[in-house]
Regions:
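Extracellular adhesion/carbohydrate-binding repeat motifs centered on closely spaced tryptophans
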Residues: 2-462
Length: 462
C-alpha cells in the first residue's frame, strides 16, 4: 500500500495559500491577511473552528484564531497535513495518540483517511482491494486481531492461507528468530480461510479434528494450531484412533517406518522401537486384533501382498496360527522372519519355529489359500499345516494321519507309494499309488492302529 510518513503534529498560523490556488473575495470568502489567508463571513468576521473549501475544491480547517491549521488532528477523526489540506484517500504514519487523554506517544502507527477525510477505525476496512484492521482509535493493527480469529501481517494486510505464527496467547515477540520447521512449542502453523478467518474445528468433545485443505488432510486443535507427528483423534477406541502427520502437517498415507506414539493411552505396550505402519487414504492406520484372536478374515491385501496387522498397528511377522474365518478350524501362516518382511510367505523353505528349531515347510503358492500351510502330499512329501512330517529317527517308516488318510512316510518325510516295506519293528506295510496304507502284515488294513497324529508347528509368541 502507498503510505506517507509524517513526523510531528503542529498548528500553522501563517500558511500561505497561493493566488493560483485560492481566490480572494470581496465579501464572504477567502481573503489574504498579510502573509496568511483567512476566511470571512458576510459581516467581515473571521470564521473559526470550521472547515472551508478553497478554489481548488480541497478542504482546510480554520483554527480558533481563524488561521489555517496544519499537521494536526481535527475533531479526533480528521487530519490536516503540512499543506493545510485535509488528508483524504491516503495512509499516514503518525505518532500514536490517546484521544481520551489528549496525548500522543513517540511510537508511530499507520492511519487511513477515507474519501470524506474521516479516519477509518474500529474494525475491518477494505482498502485497495485488501483488508486491514483498525482499533477504536484508528491505529492500523498487526498480528492477532478480533479475538485472535484473524491475523494481519506486518504491512497490516489480512492473512489468507497458511502462516507460521507465534501462538496468540504468547507474550514474547520473537517471530524474526523462528522459522517454519523449527522446534518451537510457542509457534504453530495456522490456516486462514478465504474470508481471512482462522480455521478452528468444532471438536464435539475430541481434542483434535482432521480437515481437508486442497485435497490433503491436516489436523488442528481447539485453537486452530496445526498438528504434526502422532495425534490421537479420539474417534474410537484403540490404536485406530491415531493418525500420523508429517512435518508439513499433511496426513501420512501408505507405509511409514517410525517410532510409536509416546503416549500409550490404550495400554497397548507400544514400546519405543521403530515399527512399520500402513495408513489409508484418509490417514487411518491398519489395525487388527491381538494375534491370539486373529483369523484369516483379518488378512489384508496391499499392492498384491498379504499382511496381518496386530492391535498396535504393526504388520505381524513370524510363524502364526490363524482361525479360518469363524469355522473353529485353524491354519498356519508364515509372515517372514523379521520386520523387513512382515508379509505372507508362499512356497517351500526352512522356517525357525517358536521353540527355536528349524523345520521344513510348504505354504500354498496360489489360489484362495495362497500362503496357508499345506496339509497333504506335495511333490511326494507329506505336510501338515505346512510342516514336513517325518518318521521318527530309528523307525525307518511311520504311519501318519493327515486329512483322515493314513500315509506311510520315511524319516525324510517322503511318502512311500505303491510299495511293500517293513519298519524297524518288522511290521510290514503295503501302500497305494497315493502312499496310503492298504495292508498291514499282509492283512487288508488302513493302518489306523499304527497311525499317529501329525506334528503341529510350534508357533511364535509375542
Amino acid at each position: 500500500m502507498k503510505k506517507q510518513k509524517l513526523a510531528v503534529c503542529v498548528l500553522s498560523a501563517a500558511l500561505m495559500i497561493g493566488a493560483a490556488t485560492l481566490t480572494s473575495y470581496a465579501a464572504e470568502g477567502w481573503q489574504q491577511s498579510g502573509n496568511s489567508w483567512i476566511y470571512v463571513d458576510n459581516n467581515g468576521n473571521k470564521v473559526t473552528n470550521t472547515w472551508k473549501k478553497g478554489a481548488d475544491n480541497l478542504w482546510r480547517y480554520l483554527d480558533s484564531q481563524g488561521n489555517i491549521a496544519s499537521n494536526c488532528w481535527v475533531d479526533d477523526e480528521y487530519f490536516v497535513e503540512s499543506t493545510g489540506i485535509m488528508a483524504t484517500d491516503k495512509w499516514l504514519k503518525l505518532p500514536k495518540r490517546n484521544p481520551a487523554w489528549n496525548e500522543t506517544s513517540a511510537t508511530t502507527v499507520w492511519y487511513y483517511f477515507s474519501t470524506s477525510g474521516k479516519m477509518v477505525s474500529d474494525g475491518w476496512s477494505k482498502i485497495g482491494g485488501k483488508y486491514y484492521y483498525f482499533d477504536g482509535d484508528g491505529a492500523m493493527q498487526t498480528g492477532w486481531v478480533d479475538d485472535d480469529t484473524y491475523y494481519t501481517n506486518a504491512d497490516g494486510v489480512m492473512q489468507i492461507g497458511w502462516a507460521y505464527l507465534e501462538d496468540p496467547d504468547d507474550t514474547k515477540k520473537d517471530d524474526d528468530e523462528v522459522k517454519p520447521g523449527d522446534d518451537d512449542e510457542d509457534h504453530h502453523w495456522y490456516y486462514f480461510q478465504s474470508s481471512g478467518k482462522k480455521y478452528v474445528p468444532s471438536l464435539g468433545g475430541a481434542k483434535y479434528k482432521q480437515y481437508k485443505i486442497d485435497g490433503t488432510y491436516y489436523s488442528f486443535d481447539e485453537n486452530g494450531a496445526m498438528q504434526t507427528g502422532w495425534v490421537d483423534m479420539g474417534n474410537s477406541s484403540g490404536f485406530a484412533n491415531y493418525r500420523y502427520y508429517q512435518s508439513n502437517g499433511q496426513v501420512q498415507t501408505g507405509w511409514l517406518s517410525t517410532t510409536p506414539p509416546e503416549d500409550d493411552d490404550y495400554n497397548l505396550d507400544l514400546g519405543s522401537d521403530v515399527q512399520w505402519y500402513y495408513f489409508s487414504s484418509n490417514g487411518e492406520p491398519k489395525v487388527g486384533p491381538k494375534i491370539s484372536d486373529a483369523s484369516t478374515s483379518n488378512l489384508v491385501r496391499i499392492n498384491n501382498i498379504t499382511y496381518l496387522f496386530n492391535e498396535k498397528g504393526n504388520p505381524v511377522y513370524g510363524l502364526r496360527r490363524l482361525e479360518v474365518g469363524t469355522s473353529g478350524q485353524y491354519a498356519c501362516y508364515f509372515f517372514g522372519a523379521d520386520k523387513a518382511t512382515s508379509s505372507v510367505v508362499k512356497g517351500k523353505g526352512n522356517v525357525v519355529e517358536g521353540d527355536g528349531t528349524t523345520g521344513q515347510f510348504y505354504f500354498a503358492d496360489s489360489g484362495n489359500k495362497a500362503g496357508r500351510g499345506y496339509s497333504g502330499v506335495e511333490d511326494g512329501f507329506l505336510y501338515y499345516m505346512g510342516k514336513l512330517q517325518k518318521a521318527d529317527s530309528g523307525t525307518k517308516y511311520e504311519v501318519i494321519e493327515v486329512n483322515d488318510k493314513n500315509y506311510l512316510v520315511t524319516t525324510s518325510g517322503k511318502v512311500v507309494k505303491s510299495s511293500t516295506v517293513k519298519d524297524a519293528n518288522g511290521t510290514k506295510f503295503k501302500t497305494s499309488s497315493a502312499g496310503v496304507v492298504t495292508e498291514v502284515d499282509g492283512t487288508s488294513d488302513d493302518g489306523s492302529d499304527e497311525a499317529r497324529t501329525p506334528v503341529e508347528p510350534t508357533y511364535w509368541e509375542d
